[in-house]
Structure formats: structure tokens, C-alpha cells
From Swiss-Prot:
The chain crosses the membrane at residues 15-45, 60-87. GO terms for molecular function: copper ion binding; cytochrome-c oxidase activity. Its EC number is 7.1.1.9. It is a multi-pass membrane protein. GO terms for cellular component: mitochondrial inner membrane; respiratory chain complex IV. PANTHER family: CYTOCHROME C OXIDASE SUBUNIT 2, CYTOCHROME C OXIDASE, SUBUNIT II. This is Cytochrome c oxidase subunit 2.
Amino acid sequence: MAYPFQLGLQDASSPIMEELTNFHDHTLMIVFLISSLVLYIISSMLTTKMTHTSTMDAQEVETIWTVLPAVILILIALPSLRILYMMDEINNPVLTVKTMGHQWYWSYEYTDYESLCFDSYMVPTNDLKPGELRLLEVDNRVVLPMELPIRMLISSEDVLHSWAVPSLGLKTDAIPGRLNQATLTSNRPGLFYGQCSEICGSNHSFMPIVLEMVPLKHFENWSTSMI
């Protein structure tokens, strides 16, 4: 989860988020090198008196500043396309959960079970227990098995929402009349927090998401008790 004054990304808890973090560092390094070069050129132009007023063209330089940006864009695009393909790929999910956005709460349905469904509302500040997080706790958490591929089907009953859990690298729009899908796999157990990431009305800030990733045996016990 995020912390106050945090500057970096949240700790990666899924293979996709690890790839996104590495890609972020890769792209940031390229941007840093380009910015350093541009600042060096600007400072050199401001401080030196050596100019070439008689130079009309420089084909070598023009070739370099045409080819080099193309190479840089390719170096950015190739890993980006690879991650994009990985995010859309869903291989034999063990569980499917349907998520519906409402103003202003989420509802969940475990489609592999006949009657396992519930609504998830934010816990009001006055009802929080010691240690619980303001604006992030819900009355019903989404319990899922860890280290297994899970498919999320995401849609909306009213307006546009967005189902997002940053530490798992998830952000999928919930659009009325359209069913989007995403896949998630958690590397470790724990609580993972997210929020609606699309402005959807006056209570947009009060639509938290809490995923509780547990071992498969614990998930089976929980699902049995809920049915």
C-alpha cells in the first residue's frame, strides 16, 4: 500500500507489477540521459562564445538526430509492447470473479460458485477499529487464493468507474454495457488496497477496494463458510 509522502511506486506484489516497475526504471533512465544531454547543450550555448555563423548545413548531424531518436523510441516501445501483451494474456484461470461498479460501492460475484456474491462498502470513519485505514477499509473484503491466475470481469451498473489495485498492477475501466477483463496473480499473501480511479460522482473518493490474498486451503475454507 502507499504511505504518506511516498515518492516511488508501491511494492510490486504480482509478476505484472514487477515488469511495470522495471519498465518504469528503464524508461526513466533514458529520459534522464536525454535531459542531461539537452541541459549540457543549452549550458554550452549560453557560456561559450564559439559559434559557426557561416555553417549552412550539417548532414552528419542531421542524420544523427534523426536516427538516434528512432532507436530510442524502439528501445522504449519493444518492452512496452511485451508488457502490454502479458497484461492481456489469460491462461487457464482457476477462478473468475465478476466485479460491478455502482454509485458508490462495488459488488462481487464468484461465478464458479452458485450463491457466492456480496456488496462491498467503505467503512465510515466513525466505525473504524484501531489499526484500520481511513477511507480504505471495506465491510466485505474480496478473498482470493494467492499464487494462482485469477480472471476479473469488470463492468458497471450506472456510470464509468475504474477498478484499480496499484500494487498488483491493475487498472481496468468499468463501463456500463461493456464487460472488460483483467488477470491477477499475487506473489504473496496479504491485504492489497485500491480505489475507484475514474471520477464517478460526489462520492467517488469513497469507493475503496480491498483484496485479501490467502493460501488456497484458507480460501477453500472461507468459500465454504460463505455459501
